[in-house]
């Protein structure tokens, strides 16, 4: 993810927040997480750890970004046990509020398969590190998925 893409997302997010200060604070957190993906190489020297941190920061940005979207649309799950990527994606494909378009089921499944499963594999499993090929696929997939969600 490059600076240009992050800057574009920042513009989209601030327009989406429409002056709501609480949502703008969340959007700052999302942007900071996405910016940390690029900054990881300056802060972390070990290449395997760099790749792991990229997965961590990109998915934290996505997680908070989906929470922001669902909050703005009045469709955030009420139970804390449902505040995670898998539940957010499920909610997007079955909106309760009717204030946004339904995420098509094949796109929800692709997000589960291409983002959530990889995140869980590497963030929750000791000794596992993604390779460069996965990073080169996963990070753009995360960014593209979030931009898609903002357009629902």
Describe the predicted segments one by one.
Residues 54-58, 62, 85, 108, ...:
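Short runs of predominantly hydrophobic/aromatic residues within well-ordered alpha helices
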Residues 98-152:
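Charge-enriched, short contiguous segments at helix-coil
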Residues 71-106:
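Short, charged amphipathic alpha-helical segments flanked by flexible coils
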Residues 18, 22, 46-54, 103-107, ...:
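Non-transmembrane, amphipathic alpha-helical segments
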Residues 39-46, 70, 74, 127, ...:
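Short, flexible helix-adjacent loops and helix caps
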Residues 1-51:
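Charged alpha-helical initiation segments
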Residues 57, 81-83, 124-125:
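Histidine-centered active-site/metal-ligand motif
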